[in-house]
Swiss-Prot record:
Role summary: This enzyme is involved in nucleotide metabolism: it produces dUMP, the immediate precursor of thymidine nucleotides and it decreases the intracellular concentration of dUTP so that uracil cannot be incorporated into DNA.
Chain sites annotated for binding substrate: R71, S72, G73, N84, L88, I89, D90, M98
Organism: Wigglesworthia glossinidia brevipalpis
UniProt entry tagged with the keyword Thylakoid: no
Protein name: Deoxyuridine 5'-triphosphate nucleotidohydrolase
Amino acid sequence: MKKKVNIRILDKRFGKEFFLPKYFTDGSSGMDLRACIDKEINLNPNETVLISTGVSIDISDQKISGLILPRSGLSHKYGIILSNTIGLIDSDYQGPIMISMLNRSNKNFLISIGDRIAQIIFVPLIQIEWNIVNKFVKITNRKDMGFGHSGKN
C-alpha cells in the first residue's frame, strides 16, 4: 500500500514541459527532482547555487520524513553534488523544495531548464527519548572504536 503525500505545484510548466516526480521502475526507491528555472545556470567550479524544484510538499504524517539525495551520475561524471550532502524534509514542513548544488570539479557545469538534479525518497521516522545512564549495560565487541577501526583492507 502506498502512502499519500500532498504536493503543491509552484511552476505552471508541470504537466506541459515537466512531469511530476515519479518512480521510473517498480523497484525505484527515489523520484527525480527537476531544475525549475527560467534560464540556464552556469555553475562555476567551487560555486554553490540554490535551485527550485517547482514544488512544495506536505508529508502530513509524523511517521515519515523525506530525504533529498544526490543523483549518482552527476557526482561521478561531473563532480556536481548537493552542498549539504543530504537534505532532510521534516514531516511538518510545507515549503518549497530547493536544492543546494555544489560544483566540486574544476570545470563549468551547465544546468538546463528541467534537468533532473536530485532525487527524493521517503523513509519511516522514529522519534526517540534519551535515557541517561552511567554506563552501558551490554558492552559490544566494538566498544567505542570509531573512524577506521576495522582497517583499510
